Amino acid sequence: MRRVIVIVVFSLPLCGSWKALSQTVHSPVSAAYLGLGAYSNNHVDVFSFHPNQAALAKINAASAGIYGEKRFLLKELSLYNVTVALPTHSGNFGLDARYYGFADYNETQLGLAYGRSVGNKIDVGVQFNYYSVRIAGYGNASTVNFEIGTIFHLTDKLNAGLHAYNPVGGKLGKVEEEKLASLYSAGIGYEASEKVFLSAEIEKQEDEPINVNAGLQYKFLRQLLARAGVSTATSSMYLGIGFGWKSLRMDATASYHPQLGVTPGLLLIFAFNKKEQ
């Protein structure tokens, strides 16, 4: 029981999620890894719309992905994420489901996203979420929120975008003092070559310091890629290797926090037939 209390009370503030007056849904420790392709034209996948729903507009094949991580090697801090993208002639749709925690403390978010191009230079996207948190002995609390984003195609190699999560705020459940925090970000991506992609994102979460995510992807072969990056707010680093075979891709990831240690993760993506261009 003492282990449970220590995990809930001490690990959540260090992860940047539980605060006295505001709370945000847990993202993977390697969230920057999953969303690295958001501001790319050539390296978009089913997870790319996580940091900006406008990235859905560039997904040209129905896809499904699952990601799991054992945060800081503690099973009580495990996170699971299932994502689906469905392109249509009227725009592209996405589904996102996340579960974090264990029996005595857990968070769940279910999201429905939509993204499309507006002309040749701008993509837009929006997502509606149902978020809930449960603490054993204290009950449940839930709320509904939304996030919105846009991506500008400045050149053939350079993209930039803006994103807002829960911009209007709102309380969590019936507790007036507890609310879901807002988060704003601006990102940029540069296609240095067919093999090299660079990305950077600035985030500002309510009541938290500014965070910068910077990442690099290098594609050795069509079937083999590597990603690496850093998040400045926690001085965390991440690294991953992805292997592709036909319509399947598997990535093994790891992130490192200077105080809390290593978080291993595993990602699987399956892409169905591409839609007609």
State what each model feature region is.
Residues M1-V4:
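Positively charged n-region of N-terminal signal peptides that target proteins for export
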Residues I7-G16:
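Bacterial N-terminal signal peptides
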